[in-house]
Amino acid sequence: MLTLQRLSKRFGTHWALQELDLRVGPGEIQCLLGANGAGKTTTLNLLLGFLAPTAGAAYVNGIEVAANAVLARAQLAFVPERVSLYPLLTGLENLTYFTQLGGKELSSAQLRGYLDRVGLDASAVGERVDNYSKGMRQKVALAIALAKGARALLLDEPLSGLDPKAANEFCALVRDLANGGAAVLMVTHDLFRARELGGRLGIMHAGRLLINLAASEVSHTQLDQIYLDCMHDASAAQ
């Protein structure tokens, strides 16, 4: 479970995040939408313990991040926009390495099972990662998250640069993880697929959460208009 209580972050005189209240429970998907600089990635960095909050608190499964970042981070799986894998290792070797780094010893069959679960083609498992597409790299990153056993997943612009087929496959994997009980917080600019994922859609601007609605409450057209209205009203109020 991810819990944010009046979470705020200031850099000098600039408030990057202001009094964000949010809860993402097991099996739930929360998407954060907004322009660059809205505070979305700052939110992820606060949850990961990479930044210290100016005010408020972030919790991962009841662990306050600021008080024990290492323990809280161990409860999380994070897939950044640019996945960092060892390019000269294969997908299987990367999964093996990062799993062992996390203190887990899994058999080759178990590791291959995770790669199969995320849909990495069997013929690619033994190929070097520098030959992978971005979509294939994302699948390896998700396999690492699965093998880690984390119950909370943070995704930072995971759909950026993916072709439509790869983006749809990635979203299907995210839904499967949520259906399996994971709490998912995803930052994205893709309104269409954010709605398709289900869950909740939070629209942010200038560090504030303007609205947080259920995807089932709106059509794609309505979401587009709500997003534009929020951006217009927030800009006019500044």
Regions found by a protein language model. Give the residues of each.
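Conserved ABC transporter NBD signature motif
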Residues: G56-A67, A72
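Conserved ABC ATPase "signature" region
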Residues: T96, Q100, S108-A124
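Catalytic Walker B motif of ABC-type/P-loop ATPase nucleotide-binding domains
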Residues: L153-D156
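Helix N-cap at the start of a conserved alpha-helix in ABC-type nucleotide-binding domains
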Residues: P164-A166
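H-loop/switch region of ABC-family ATPase nucleotide-binding domains
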Residues: T188-H189
